């Protein structure tokens, strides 16, 4: 049997596909890589906020819907909380480091005033501005190799990216991991997800064998919290869950100009849906109490 895997053509995306392929090859399944060019790849000078939601996923998923591929592989943080009704999550791999990192010669609080810091994430920009409003924050697009090249050329004094990308690429660079209480990661950061057609039970059954159930429960909790908050808050949210046996620990945070709201909770004997929903509702209640939303 051969499974066709659709993904973007970047080096990082290709490595993520290879990680999935390694699991399939151990099961005796052959694979074929289907490269998809997305709008995000074609317009790398445009800020992500201008390209719209789902910019990394829609065209890749469409290849699955059009039967040009059997499954799509993504970084799960790029997947909208609601995907096509004809698609579903088949599997996730064990989570890689979920944190944000600052690649720089100095840590965040030792950077000189007016240091140039690169990021294309509004969430990261908002956290940066809250802690260090004396920094010069500039957009930074392109694949990880491009971003690192710009940093080493001296165009930036530091750049903020996901630790998982450095981990997967095996890049040897000096960096500082950002505490999730201060820089709460994007929901599902560090998780590789496989998406397929709902009615394709044969392929779905294969991926059920490689699915990491604990990581999936964490992903569900984070996505549920994000979906609860999403309709009531226009500022990008960080959501991070950990699982200990049957218990969950969750952090949800966002920065609103000079004010930053963070909620941290422990949840006992709850499903991931229940834990995520409760954390999201408590965050909404807090930002209402603070007058951030009506």
Curated annotation (Swiss-Prot):
Pathway of action: Porphyrin-containing compound metabolism; protoporphyrin-IX biosynthesis; coproporphyrinogen-III from 5-aminolevulinate: step 2/4
SUPFAM superfamilies per record: Periplasmic binding protein-like II, Porphobilinogen deaminase (hydroxymethylbilane synthase), C-terminal domain
Source superkingdom: Archaea
Any Gene Ontology CC annotation: cytoplasm
GO molecular function: hydroxymethylbilane synthase activity
PROSITE patterns reported in the protein's UniProt record: PORPHOBILINOGEN_DEAM
InterPro entries associated with the record: HemC, Porphobilin_deaminase_cofac_BS, Porphobilin_deaminase_N, Porphobilinogen_deaminase_C, Porphobilinogen_deaminase_C_sf
Pfam families: Porphobil_deam (PF01379), Porphobil_deamC (PF03900)
Signal peptide: none
One annotated GO biological process: protoporphyrinogen IX biosynthetic process
Cofactor field: dipyrromethane
Family statement: Belongs to the HMBS family.
Miscellaneous comment as given in the Swiss-Prot or TrEMBL entry: The porphobilinogen subunits are added to the dipyrromethane group.
Protein name: Probable porphobilinogen deaminase
The organism of origin for this protein: Sulfurisphaera tokodaii (strain DSM 16993 / JCM 10545 / NBRC 100140 / 7) (Sulfolobus tokodaii)
Organism ancestry: Archaea, Thermoproteota, Thermoprotei, Sulfolobales, Sulfolobaceae
Gene: hemC
